[in-house]
Amino acid sequence: NGFCIVRGKDPKAKGQKGDLLLLLKEQPGNSQILEIGVICIDGQKYPEKAWIDVTGKLVEL
């Protein structure tokens, strides 16, 4: 059970079952936080080793 914190203009992360992902999306043009996503990898809704964005959608790199 680990955790990952990613901050940037288009943050993405992946993890293993039980991991917690904290994604912080910055506004374009500055570093103010626009959106925050907190996701727990459960192996079902959020599968292991799949890239996930701040909204919780699975994404391809």
Model-derived features: positions:
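Short, glycine-biased loop/turn motifs at secondary-structure junctions and
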Residues: 1-61
